[in-house]
């Protein structure tokens, strides 16, 4: 049974949890008013014509409705989301995690688990495809809906961010490109579910092992994700370019069909 992870909204507690455990939760970081604005902007973003979108910008479910699963690189197509990922409160928080280095915003994306979605994002480490050295990078996730063990919340292996990158392989899952070749021993790390209410934010280290399960509820589970790295980190551009080429081939083979999307799909 995954451990439910509580944390007080205290800066030092959050930073200590992130550094020692590889993750943390900040409750009510976005007010109800701020959250409604973000939700409205998400709906506006998804209502536009996406027929000219680049391969991989949008991932759809393989169902009759072609429901949206993922929207990547939102900051490249929206001034609002480009600005939101640089929101001062987010930058200040991330900068605290990095210590004496500046926080650099990399991107914004939406992950939407539709009601009763059966798929899982397998266990993986983000740095298996981000390639940061040193691994001073973080995923910041804003809950637009309740995110629980039942709806497919992020589950982290506590302390796994300290061991470096393990061997990965193609996952075969649209929206989650890589997965661990083999899992660490069950007794080595505790599973911790990052349960979130709308407006809460989670932080997970780029090296922490994590996954998400199926959505067993009748509701959407939407998470808006932002990625950051520190000014002292460098990206292996050769490895990233090869990864992006491989991913493009996989997406081309795996997904085709309609690029239409209505508000009811999101």
Where are the predicted features?
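Extracellular structured ligand-interaction cores
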Residues: 135-139, 151, 191-193, 221-223
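A structural signal for short, well-ordered beta-strand segments
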Residues: 107-108, 140-142, 224-228
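Active-site region of the double-stranded beta-helix
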Residues: 100-103, 127-130, 135, 142-153, ...
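Non-heme Fe(II)/2-oxoglutarate
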Residues: 48, 53-60, 201-203, 207-266
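A generic structural micro-feature
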Residues: 131-136, 186, 218-220
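Double-stranded beta-helix
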Residues: 147-211, 233-236
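Non-heme Fe(II)-dependent double-stranded beta-helix
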Residues: 1-21, 27-123, 129-131, 168-169, ...
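Glycine-rich phosphate/pyrophosphate-binding beta-alpha loops
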Residues: 126-128, 137, 210-215
């Amino acid at each position: 049974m995954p451990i439910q992870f509580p944390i007080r909204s205290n800066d030092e507690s959050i930073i200590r949890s992130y550094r020692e455990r590889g993750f943390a939760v900040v409750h009510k970081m976005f007010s109800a008013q701020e959250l409604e604005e973000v939700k409205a902007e998400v709906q506006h973003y998804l209502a536009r014509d996406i027929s000219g979108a680049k391969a991989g910008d949008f991932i759809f479910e393989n169902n009759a409705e072609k429901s949206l699963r993922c929207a990547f690189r939102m900051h490249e197509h929206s001034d609002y989301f480009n600005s939101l990922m640089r929101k001062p409160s987010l930058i200040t928080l991330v900068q605290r995690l990095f210590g004496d280095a500046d926080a650099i915003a990399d991107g914004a994306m939406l992950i939407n688990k539709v009601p009763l979605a059966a798929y899982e994002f397998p266990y993986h480490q983000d740095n298996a495809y981000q390639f940061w050295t040193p691994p001073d990078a973080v995923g910041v996730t804003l809950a637009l809906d309740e995110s629980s063990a039942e709806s497919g919340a992020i589950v982290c292996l506590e302390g796994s961010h300290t061991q470096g990158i393990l061997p990965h392989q193609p996952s075969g899952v649209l929206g989650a490109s890589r997965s661990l070749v083999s899992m660490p021993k069950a007794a080595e790390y505790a599973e911790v579910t990052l349960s979130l209410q709308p407006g809460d934010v989670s932080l997970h280290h780029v090296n922490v092992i994590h996954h998400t399960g199926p959505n067993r509820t009748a509701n959407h589970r939407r998470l808006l994700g932002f990625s950051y790295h520190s000014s002292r980190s460098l990206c292996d551009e050769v490895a990233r370019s090869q990864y992006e080429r491989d991913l493009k081939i996989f997406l081309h083979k795996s997904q085709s069909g309609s690029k239409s999307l209505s508000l009811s799909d999101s």
